[in-house]
Amino acid sequence: MSVSGLKAELKFLASIFDKNHERFRIVSWKLDELHCQFLVPPPAPPGSPHSPPPPLTLHCNITESYPSSSPIWFVDSDDPNLTSVLERLEDTKNNNSNGTTEEVTSEEEEEEEMAEDIEDLDHYEMKEEEPISGKKSEDEGIEKENLAILEKIRKTQRQDHLNGAVSGSVQASDRLMKELRDIYRSQSYKTGIYSVELINDSLYDWHVKLQKVDPDSPLHSDLQILKEKEGIEYILLNFSFKDNFPFDPPFVRVVLPVLSGGYVLGGGALCMELLTKQGWSSAYSIESVIMQINATLVKGKARVQFGANKNQYNLARAQQSYNSIVQIHEKNGWYTPPKEDG
């Protein structure tokens, strides 16, 4: 679909579901994203005093292949009822995506007519809308080598789909692609605070290297010594994502070096409420998680254990340690340090 055709469709939808609609409102939109609200009907009978429940915030990502592939919806909530609604939307989208080539062609032929028909809707103000010339391409600000990685992932996904060997979910894959693009644009990534590498080109399995920590910390000094001894000057993390990401957190563990302190558990798991279902939010970005882990290691006075058995860090042991600590904290709660402690 052309940019003008997509813009025409979105503008038309925004004119129908405006900010005064009684049930569903498009708060703002861009060519690749919608920010919407669903106003939940109050549970009390009409006429009785009540406070209306807060609206549900929904996000819609429009992929490059639209309309051949359906938009991806996600919500900033861990409510299982909302998750089931999204699953039903996925089923509906799959059924509706089997249209014929003639229908797609017909839609393309109607784009220009629609654009002309709704020119009079230009007076509607959308806070996030910008002139086309000023809009950032989703690839803007990304280095060529990283664009090549993104393109390789897209090609692999298409080939897997054709071969019937699709892994993961559409929802998780689209969100992870967005996270990866955001990381590639990030100044923290570009300045070498951390790096990201996909393991075996899998979108669901990442190696993250923490390459810069607080220079005044003992951990920084340890990493300098480690560089001299072993040629390693980073902390290697493994991020594993499930099909229901972003509604479940990634599983994160330290791969190397062996650390003491810093809330690092046996096997390399991390004792952080942020990485549990209880403390996780689907609104969190992966970069914010990476930066929080970096800060937590320093705050927890992590130190490199020189000469330690490197085989003690593995996935099975990390998962065991993680599950044990989560059970303990579910019973006893999590300790929140004073604000002055960061």
UniProtKB/Swiss-Prot annotation:
Regions of compositional bias (Acidic residues) in chain numbering: 104-116
Listed EC numbers: 2.3.2.23
Gene3D superfamilies for this protein: Ubiquitin Conjugating Enzyme
Compartments it resides in: Cytoplasm
One GO BP annotation of this record: protein K48-linked ubiquitination
CDD domains found in the cross-reference section: UBCc_UBE2Q
Source organism, top-level taxon: Eukaryota
Catalysed reactions listed for this entry: S-ubiquitinyl-[E1 ubiquitin-activating enzyme]-L-cysteine + [E2 ubiquitin-conjugating enzyme]-L-cysteine = [E1 ubiquitin-activating enzyme]-L-cysteine + S-ubiquitinyl-[E2 ubiquitin-conjugating enzyme]-L-cysteine
An example Gene Ontology CC term for this record: cytoplasm
Domain UBC core: 171-335
Biological or metabolic pathway of the protein: Protein modification; protein ubiquitination
Region (Disordered): 88-116
Active site positions: 271
GO MF annotation, one: ubiquitin conjugating enzyme activity
Record PTM: Auto-ubiquitinated in vitro.
Pfam family, any one: UQ_con
Annotated keywords: ATP-binding, Cytoplasm, Nucleotide-binding, Transferase, Ubl conjugation, Ubl conjugation pathway
UniProt similarity note: Belongs to the ubiquitin-conjugating enzyme family.
Function: Accepts ubiquitin from the E1 complex and catalyzes its covalent attachment to other proteins. In vitro catalyzes 'Lys-48'-linked polyubiquitination.
Name of this chain's protein: Ubiquitin-conjugating enzyme E2 Q2
Originating species: Bos taurus
